[in-house]
Amino acid sequence: MLPFVQEQIGAFIVNFFILSVVCAVTLVVCLAILTAIRLCVQCVSGCHTLVFLPAVHIYNTGRAAYVKFQESHPPYPPEDWV
Protein backbone atom coordinates (compact mmCIF):
# COMPACT_ATOMS: atom_id res chain seq x y z
CA MET A 1 0.00 0.00 0.00
CA LEU A 2 1.20 3.49 -0.77
CA PRO A 3 2.12 5.75 2.17
CA PHE A 4 -0.37 8.52 1.26
CA VAL A 5 -3.20 5.95 1.16
CA GLN A 6 -2.33 4.87 4.69
CA GLU A 7 -2.32 8.53 5.76
CA GLN A 8 -5.76 9.05 4.20
CA ILE A 9 -7.14 5.96 5.92
CA GLY A 10 -5.61 7.10 9.22
CA ALA A 11 -7.05 10.59 8.77
CA PHE A 12 -10.46 9.07 7.98
CA ILE A 13 -10.35 6.93 11.13
CA VAL A 14 -9.27 9.88 13.30
CA ASN A 15 -11.92 12.16 11.80
CA PHE A 16 -14.59 9.49 12.32
CA PHE A 17 -13.49 9.07 15.95
CA ILE A 18 -13.54 12.83 16.56
CA LEU A 19 -16.97 13.12 14.94
CA SER A 20 -18.26 10.24 17.09
CA VAL A 21 -16.95 11.87 20.26
CA VAL A 22 -18.47 15.24 19.31
CA CYS A 23 -21.84 13.60 18.63
CA ALA A 24 -21.73 11.70 21.92
CA VAL A 25 -20.84 14.86 23.88
CA THR A 26 -23.59 16.81 22.12
CA LEU A 27 -26.09 14.06 22.91
CA VAL A 28 -25.09 14.01 26.59
CA VAL A 29 -25.36 17.82 26.84
CA CYS A 30 -28.81 17.79 25.19
CA LEU A 31 -30.00 15.05 27.52
CA ALA A 32 -28.71 16.99 30.54
CA ILE A 33 -30.55 20.13 29.42
CA LEU A 34 -33.79 18.24 28.78
CA THR A 35 -33.51 16.49 32.15
CA ALA A 36 -32.99 19.82 33.91
CA ILE A 37 -36.03 21.28 32.14
CA ARG A 38 -38.12 18.25 33.12
CA LEU A 39 -37.00 18.59 36.74
CA CYS A 40 -37.97 22.27 36.73
CA VAL A 41 -41.41 21.40 35.34
CA GLN A 42 -41.91 18.77 38.04
CA CYS A 43 -40.85 21.23 40.76
CA VAL A 44 -43.24 23.88 39.46
CA SER A 45 -46.05 21.33 39.28
CA GLY A 46 -45.38 20.19 42.84
CA CYS A 47 -45.24 23.77 44.06
CA HIS A 48 -48.54 24.46 42.31
CA THR A 49 -50.15 21.41 43.90
CA LEU A 50 -48.73 21.83 47.40
CA VAL A 51 -48.70 25.62 47.79
CA PHE A 52 -51.00 27.46 45.41
CA LEU A 53 -54.04 25.15 45.34
CA PRO A 54 -54.43 25.06 49.15
CA ALA A 55 -53.89 28.82 49.30
CA VAL A 56 -56.59 29.39 46.68
CA HIS A 57 -58.93 27.02 48.53
CA ILE A 58 -58.35 28.85 51.84
CA TYR A 59 -58.83 32.22 50.15
CA ASN A 60 -62.08 31.14 48.48
CA THR A 61 -63.40 29.59 51.71
CA GLY A 62 -62.59 32.73 53.67
CA ARG A 63 -64.13 34.96 51.06
CA ALA A 64 -67.31 32.87 50.95
CA ALA A 65 -67.56 33.01 54.76
CA TYR A 66 -67.02 36.78 54.68
CA VAL A 67 -69.71 37.28 52.03
CA LYS A 68 -72.11 35.03 53.95
CA PHE A 69 -71.41 36.94 57.16
CA GLN A 70 -71.96 40.28 55.43
CA GLU A 71 -75.28 39.14 53.97
CA SER A 72 -76.69 37.61 57.16
CA HIS A 73 -77.13 40.47 59.62
CA PRO A 74 -79.31 39.95 62.64
CA PRO A 75 -82.60 41.80 62.43
CA TYR A 76 -82.59 45.37 63.65
CA PRO A 77 -84.51 46.06 66.84
CA PRO A 78 -87.89 47.70 66.42
CA GLU A 79 -87.85 51.47 66.29
CA ASP A 80 -89.92 51.82 69.44
CA TRP A 81 -86.99 50.31 71.38
CA VAL A 82 -84.87 53.32 70.57
Swiss-Prot record:
Transmembrane segments: 17-37
Chief place of localization: host cell
Calcium is among the record's keywords: no
InterPro entries: E_protein_bCoV, E_protein_CoV
Membrane side Virion surface: residue ranges: 1-16
Keyword annotations from UniProtKB, A to Z: Apoptosis, Host Golgi apparatus, Host membrane, Membrane, Transmembrane, Transmembrane helix
Magnesium is among the record's keywords: no
A biological process term (GO) from this entry: disruption of cellular anatomical structure in another organism
PROSITE patterns with a match to the protein in the record: COV_E (PS51926)
Top-level division of the source organism's lineage: Viruses
Pfam families: CoV_E
Residue ranges that the UniProt entry lists as topological domain Intravirion: 38-78
Annotated membrane topology: Single-pass type III membrane protein
Intracellular or extracellular location(s): Host Golgi apparatus membrane
Record GO cellular component, one term: membrane
Quaternary structure annotation from Swiss-Prot or TrEMBL: Homopentamer. Interacts with membrane protein M in the budding compartment of the host cell, which is located between endoplasmic reticulum and the Golgi complex. Interacts with Nucleoprotein.
Functional summary from the UniProt entry: Plays a central role in virus morphogenesis and assembly. Acts as a viroporin and self-assembles in host membranes forming pentameric protein-lipid pores that allow ion transport. Also plays a role in the induction of apoptosis.
HAMAP family: BETA_CORONA_E
Family the entry assigns: Belongs to the betacoronaviruses E protein family.
Protein name: Envelope small membrane protein
Naturally occurring in which organism (per UniProt): Bat coronavirus HKU5
Name of the gene: E
